[in-house]
Amino acid sequence: MQAVILSERALGDTDGLFAAAVAHIARKLGRVKPLDADALPADRAGKLHALDEWAGSDIDWRGELVRFYEDHIPLHLRPSPGLNAALRALQARGVRIGCWSAGPEEAARIVVHHLGLSRGVEAIAAGGGEAVAQLAAELGAPAAETVVVTREEGELAVAAGLGLATAAPDELGGLAAETAVPQ
């Protein structure tokens, strides 16, 4: 294994944090320009597109999302000593690490930082399958040597479609132990 791509969702309940942020944006910025959070698409990519369309160039909803994440992330996510130890062990073995998020990238950067992973995560990409492919290319490892860590069915399908191996988050420690130390 030469590279690991961590799904943001494998790091914790980021969907709950994102939903809370969208509800906050609708309450706060919806007073400036009406926004019905319940009318937004169910999937995160759809929500991002709808929010961009709604805001246009008039409203900085992404800035408000960043502020919400920074203020509320401790209520939703806690750093994991086990995860951090596994990632350090992988890095010590020369494995390159990236993080893939459904988006937006600004939020993923806050998640990675809050969980204490900033030094170990070399690259972050947000979006669908194209983001995973971009991230795998940026990490420079062949598909056969790249593992996507996730538990989400849709993300497992994306990884399989790109020829990438997959692992569940609780298997990360085992992967670190199995990876050979570079000579």
Name each region found by the language model.
Residues 1, 88, 105, 109-183:
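Asp-based, Mg2+/Mn2+-dependent phosphohydrolase catalytic module
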Residues 1-81:
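N-terminal helical cap/lid subdomain that shapes the substrate entry/recognition surface
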Residues 9, 73-74, 95, 142-144:
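Short, contiguous strand/loop micro-motifs
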Residues 11, 97, 148-149:
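Conserved SAM-binding loop
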Residues 59, 70-99, 105-109, 129-133:
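Short, acidic loop-to-helix structural element flanking the phosphoryl-transfer center
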